[in-house]
């Protein structure tokens, strides 16, 4: 279970771009739909708690899910799974960006990513809104 927690949150950390809010769509899919670790309502509650506690929302959410499933070891593993791989990618991308920042193709790529991030955030708002609203039909 600890390895699955690590790999799941590593996947969330590597394959999403943007803020922690952009990560929530994939997190919900992994935690609620694919692994059935939390119900939709529990996930919405976990997101709410993650927002009001100090720190980045996804780190808080990973810590919450890990704690719920496997206590302190689960919290550590889920959190490390989320932050270690993206930090490695960030170091590599930063080096590449410094070397290629004036390249017109790189500038166009960054402009192209923006609409995708907006779409991901809109998806999260809709899915969380459905479970957050009482008596939503």
Role assignments for model-derived ranges:
Residues 1-50, 64-137:
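Multi-pass membrane proteins that catalyze or facilitate reactions on polyprenyl-/lipid-phosphate substrates
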Residues 60:
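Conserved beta-loop-alpha segment that forms the PLP phosphate-binding cup at the N-terminus of a helix
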